[in-house]
Amino acid sequence: MIGGRLIKVCGLRAADNMRAVAALPGVDLVGFIFHPASPRCVTDVPDVPLPDGVRRVGVFVDVPAEQIVATAHRYGLHLVQLHGHESPDMCRRLTDRGLGVIKAFPATPEAARNDTTRYATSGCRLFLFDTPTASHGGSGRTFDWHVLQDYVGQTPFLLGGGLGPDARDALSRFTHPRLAGYDLNSRFERCPAEKDVEALRTFLQRLDGASVPGQTSPASVRP
């Protein structure tokens, strides 16, 4: 965590890169994308021991629940991130199978106000707000964070959508009572699925030195 915020680094593939990212101070979640259309798609997750407290997240798009459960068991995923049109009932079924669920939403006023309400009792551990794209994330494009003023739910959320090395000052000014952390991906890459470890290290150090307002209690959001 950095300043009480979860840090998720998504879109990993190679063992050495995963090991280096997971070892960075502040990283809580490392993500693997199981969506064939993504340039960061994985067909296998390296069997790399993680530091204490770091959790594996699998990202899926409109995949049957049983397939998600099987993949999670095979690779030791602690959480699953659902980035498609998965229903509240599916989220609940996965939760009942012992998986932490992160449900992603396009960052639109409609999603922030209404779509999230349908998932309020689905057992989701976290929500994720990302830039609306046909590619289901990883676009490197940002969105207007003011949209999230329309979100008044109780489920903590991760902020995604093109966060890059230049985002620290804006993040230090952004407040929301349910902001739990940040999702970092394509703008910290040398090429798809290869994270720039030094760029991440520098960003996290600078973020740690910034004043991050409106902290959420770590006990309420840590997976």
Give, region by region, the residue ranges found by the protein language model.
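Conserved N-terminal beta1-alpha1 strand-loop-helix module at the mouth
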Residues: M1-P223
